[in-house]
């Protein structure tokens, strides 16, 4: 799993699951976690690509929380939507753990893959609900 994909999944993952594995990393006496940037809230511009003309435009600002940590020489970073300092810090810890080759890395990757599957299922469910509202203009004519 590449780092971009990991960032995306950490940002959208269930915060309880992310925080649980981050706690286990913190409990490991052999792993020293240094907080480089405490969780801070900020705003980012959410961008969207128009499906018809393929042009990008700004929808509006979104509240996010970001954090950065270091494990050994490896930096970990995470940004999550909303005001959730615990999830941002946990995400950064998980990212740094994977980058540093922490013993829990395989379990972290498994957790992120299961979150990816859950997110895909949620998206399919949403599309199925939206499909029932689709109007077929050919039939109406």
Regions found by a protein language model. Give the residues of each.
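Charge-rich, low-complexity N-terminal segments
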Residues: 1-27
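Cysteine/selenocysteine-centered motifs that mediate thiol-based redox chemistry or coordinate metal-sulfur cofactors
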Residues: 29, 99-141
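A broadly conserved detector of short glycine/acidic/proline-rich loop/turn motifs that flank catalytic sites
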Residues: 49, 82, 141
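A generic short-segment signal for beta-strand/edge and adjacent turn/coil regions
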Residues: 1-4, 13, 33-40, 45-48, ...
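A hydrophobic, small-residue-rich beta->alpha segment in the mid-to-C-terminal subdomain
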Residues: 74-110
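Structured beta-strand/loop patches that form or line metal/cofactor-binding pockets in enzymes
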Residues: 26-71, 77-78
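Short secondary-structure boundary micro-motifs
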Residues: 8, 17-19, 39, 50-54, ...
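Short, functionally important structural connectors and interaction interfaces within domains
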Residues: 2, 51-54, 127-129
């Amino acid at each position: 799993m590449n780092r971009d994909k990991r960032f995306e999944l950490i940002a959208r993952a269930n915060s309880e699951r992310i925080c649980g594995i981050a706690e286990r990393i913190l409990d490991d006496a052999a792993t020293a976690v240094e907080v480089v940037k405490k969780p801070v809230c900020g705003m980012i511009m959410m961008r969207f690509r128009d499906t018809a003309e393929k042009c990008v435009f700004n929808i509006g600002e979104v509240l996010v929380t970001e954090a950065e940590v270091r494990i050994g020489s490896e930096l970990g970073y995470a940004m999550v939507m909303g005001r959730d300092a615990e999830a941002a810090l946990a995400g950064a810890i998980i990212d740094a753990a994977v980058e540093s080759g922490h013993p829990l890395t395989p379990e972290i990757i498994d957790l992120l893959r299961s979150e990816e599957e859950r997110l895909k299922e949620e998206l399919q469910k949403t599309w199925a609900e939206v499909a029932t509202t689709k109007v077929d203009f050919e039939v109406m004519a």
